[in-house]
């Protein structure tokens, strides 16, 4: 770690957490000359007062002092951050940026860089249903949904690509007045009329474009930005994520007949505020800038949202102190009681690629659902095999051919077999009727134009290839896919889901939690060519993130005084370590294995259990100060971030003592002792006993082994954990757990330990 705040807030660009494409060539070149102005974010820390006009005036004055001209200062200023924190975005040359960074009130100057780009059954699967399910007896009229009136008083802020407001998922039927605390607004714009398109469901709609335009010549060039100059969603991503988090009930929805059911969000009566920061740039899934993101966070803090759902992130961590969706802006939101839920990224299954790793973010991994779309393949010898697809018929009956890497095969009118193709467009226009694609298992299904793609694994693919090579005139029949819910489909951590350990702060476990994020059905923009009646199946941690955001909205309704850290603790300590049906959860990858904390954090989110966790590992500003101090940040910088004088203790606090609902020891030499503090949020008189599952070769001891809560005044207790290794050589990570149980509540935290032997 670097011992300076500048590295702490090193924020690169922001990209939708979907799938990667190429770089952004139309933006200002990295090697621009000093005379070229670019966007820089000048961060000044916590606000010193509550008058936003005074902040804007002071930002103008600082720029005027730098540029020696009122007009130049006015023209330079892009955004003034004035609600959640103090700072501004401005067009500056590199020398001007360097000069202003030396101002005594400036904490850091951050370049507004942009990089390349890298959701129906979900709620039944998680036991969060209006009707009881086989997995959760508590999902009834007394369940979390009903206890919170489905989140009717919660406000979910969605920072994304905007909203398609006409979608039925944003109807406000049966909703009461907008919560009185709401201070936001709807902004009209291109094909978006605030008076028509906003209602008691969609209560906020804003868009942020200045940061992007400043990087692209200052004009809204429609040959580059093919989007609406408003909150209207041209991509569909924001509409999809908003649906998952808080969409209203829409019955009898399907994707070409598949996955039929009722679409709704996790908090179906919650209010939605949409903050559009990502734009449809030609050749990309969506482009967003840090400057626009900061302003959206700033406004959301002012608007008083309860949770921010952010399916956005930077790339794989490199050398930055924090590779985060927005480290500083998110910190200020959390400090003001807003839970920020962020996508962990889609760079799995390799290790150490988790993004959005700040300790105050709730970082989400993605799992599959217990749902599949089996597709019957019948070979000409009457052998029947099963694959998966989104093919909905009618039945295909053709000759069958193998397409090798040279593609030197007559494929017209045939079904072809391919292995590991990543270029489906390569067979377009060649008259192919269907494609059977053999690949490693990842549960990712797709439709490619009008050609049906049938997905299978290598074993079945090899079986089909053997049939082709031993048959004079091979043929195949492909039946329409069907929808299968429940067993035998297993819950798995998705292959694409980014994994820990946390390469930025190894002692901070990331991801925190996992949720369904594969083939999630939700509303999209009808402009999406793959949409069916305004709905689509998307995959990514972009989809698992709003699942958790919707659950947080319900928890906030039930426990309005809980902090964001308490919310996270409730999710982590009550999560499923097996699937809801009791089967093991595996992690997809080159070698399928049982999932561990680096795959899914605490486990698969369990909404009803999280409502009554018993104990929580709470955190506040003091814990975040300890985090910064333990990483070596100087007192003056921390003081400016917090807006009050702060002094780190001597010796500096241990990062192992940060009160997380997890224990991660990345370099255990012999033994170490750490502390945790729990807050009783259950019955006043409770007794909890420790149950330890030590990692292999590690001895864990807890002191005390019993926690006795006997009064309202005694709700907070601290305990210590000693970890001692018996390994004689450097080891990889081994995993265990620590559970506090009172016979009703099992409060479980994951333990991850790696032994490091000094040379």
From Swiss-Prot:
InterPro entries from the UniProt entry: Peptidase_S8/S53_dom, Peptidase_S8/S53_dom_sf, Peptidase_S8_Ser-AS, Peptidase_S8_subtilisin-rel, Peptidases_S8_3, S8pro/Inhibitor_I9, S8pro/Inhibitor_I9_sf, SBT
EC numbers for this chain: 3.4.21.-
The UniProt record lists the keyword Signal: yes
The keyword Hydrolase belongs to this UniProt entry's keyword annotation: yes
GO molecular function: serine-type endopeptidase activity
Subcellular location: Secreted
Major location (coarse): secreted
Sequence similarity: Belongs to the peptidase S8 family.
Protein name: Subtilisin-like protease SBT3.14
Gene source species: Arabidopsis thaliana (Mouse-ear cress)
Gene encoding the protein: SBT3.14
């Amino acid at each position: 770690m670097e011992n300076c705040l500048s590295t702490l807030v090193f924020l690169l660009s922001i990209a939708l957490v979907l799938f990667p494409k190429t770089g952004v060539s139309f933006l200002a070149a990295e090697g621009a000359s000093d005379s070229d102005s670019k966007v820089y974010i000048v961060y000044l820390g916590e606000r010193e007062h509550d008058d936003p006009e005074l902040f804007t005036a002071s930002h103008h004055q600082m720029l005027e002092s730098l540029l020696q001209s009122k007009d130049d200062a006015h023209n330079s200023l892009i955004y003034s951050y004035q609600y959640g924190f103090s700072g501004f975005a401005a067009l500056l040359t590199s020398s001007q940026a360097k000069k202003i960074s030396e101002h005594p009130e400036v904490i850091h100057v951050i370049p507004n860089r942009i990089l390349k780009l890298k959701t129906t059954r979900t709620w039944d699967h998680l036991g969060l249903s209006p009707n009881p399910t086989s997995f959760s007896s508590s999902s009834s009229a007394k369940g979390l949904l009903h206890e919170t009136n489905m989140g009717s008083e919660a406000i979910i802020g969605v920072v994304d690509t905007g909203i398609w407001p006409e979608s039925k998922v944003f109807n406000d039927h049966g909703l009461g007045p907008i919560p009185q605390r709401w201070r936001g607004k709807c902004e009209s714009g291109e094909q978006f009329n605030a008076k028509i398109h906003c209602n008691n469901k969609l209560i906020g709609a804003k868009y942020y474009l200045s940061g992007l335009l400043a990087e692209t010549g200052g004009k809204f060039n429609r040959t580059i930005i093919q989007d609406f100059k408003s909150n209207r969603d041209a991509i569909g991503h924001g509409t999809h994520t908003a649906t998952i988090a808080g969409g209203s009930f829409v019955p009898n929805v399907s994707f070409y007949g598949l996955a039929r059911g009722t679409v709704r969000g996790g908090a179906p009566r919650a209010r939605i505020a949409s903050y559009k920061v990502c734009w449809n740039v030609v050749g990309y899934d969506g482009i967003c800038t840090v400057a626009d993101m900061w302003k959206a966070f700033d406004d959301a803090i002012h608007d008083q949202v309860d949770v921010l759902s952010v399916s956005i992130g930077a790339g794989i961590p490199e050398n930055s102190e924090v590779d985060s969706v927005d480290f500083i802006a998110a910190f200020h939101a959390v400090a003001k009681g807003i839970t920020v839920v962020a996508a962990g990224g889609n760079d799995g299954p390799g290790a150490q690629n988790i993004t959005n790793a700040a300790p105050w973010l709730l970082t989400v991994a993605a799992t599959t659902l217990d749902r599949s779309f089996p597709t019957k393949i019948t070979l000409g010898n009457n052998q029947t095999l099963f694959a998966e697809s989104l093919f909905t018929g009618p039945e295909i009956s053709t000759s069958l051919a193998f397409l090798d890497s040279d593609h030197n095969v007559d494929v017209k009118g045939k079904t072809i077999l391919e292995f590991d193709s990543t270029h489906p467009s390569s067979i377009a226009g060649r008259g192919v009727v269907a494609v059977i694609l053999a690949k490693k298992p990842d549960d990712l299904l797709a439709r490619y134009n009008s050609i049906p793609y049938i997905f299978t694994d290598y074993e079945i693919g090899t079986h089909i290839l053997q049939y082709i090579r031993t048959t004079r005139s091979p043929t195949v029949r492909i039946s329409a896919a069907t929808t299968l819910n429940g067993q035998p489909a297993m819950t798995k951590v998705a292959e694409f889901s980014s994994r820990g350990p946390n390469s930025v702060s190894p002692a901070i476990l990331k991801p925190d939690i996992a949720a369904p994020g594969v083939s999630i059905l939700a509303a999209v923009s009808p402009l999406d060519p793959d949409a069916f009646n305004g709905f689509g199946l998307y995959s990514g941690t972009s989809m698992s993130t709003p699942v958790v955001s919707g659950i947080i909205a319900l928890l906030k309704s039930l426990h309005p005084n809980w902090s964001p850290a308490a919310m996270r603790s409730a999710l982590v300590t009550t999560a499923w370590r097996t699937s809801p049906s009791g089967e093991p959860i595996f992690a997809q990858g080159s070698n399928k294995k049982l999932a561990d904390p680096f795959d899914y954090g605490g486990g698969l989110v369990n909404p009803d259990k999280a409502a009554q966790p018993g104990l929580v590992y709470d955190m506040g500003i003091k814990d975040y100060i300890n985090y910064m101090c333990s990483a070596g940040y100087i007192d003056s910088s921390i003081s400016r971030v917090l807006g009050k004088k702060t002094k780190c203790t001597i010796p500096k606090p241990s990062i192992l003592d940060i009160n997380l609902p997890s224990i991660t020891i990345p370099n255990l030499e012999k033994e170490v002792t750490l502390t945790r503090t729990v807050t009783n949020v259950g019955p006043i008189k409770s007794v909890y006993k420790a149950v330890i599952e030590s990692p292999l070769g590690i001895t864990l001891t807890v002191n005390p082994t019993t926690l006795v809560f006997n009064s309202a005044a005694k709700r907070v207790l601290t305990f210590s954990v000693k970890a001692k290794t018996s390994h004689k050589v450097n080891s990889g990570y081994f995993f265990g757990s620590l559970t506090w149980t009172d016979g009703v509540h099992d409060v479980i935290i994951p333990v991850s330990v790696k032994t490091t032997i000094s040379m």
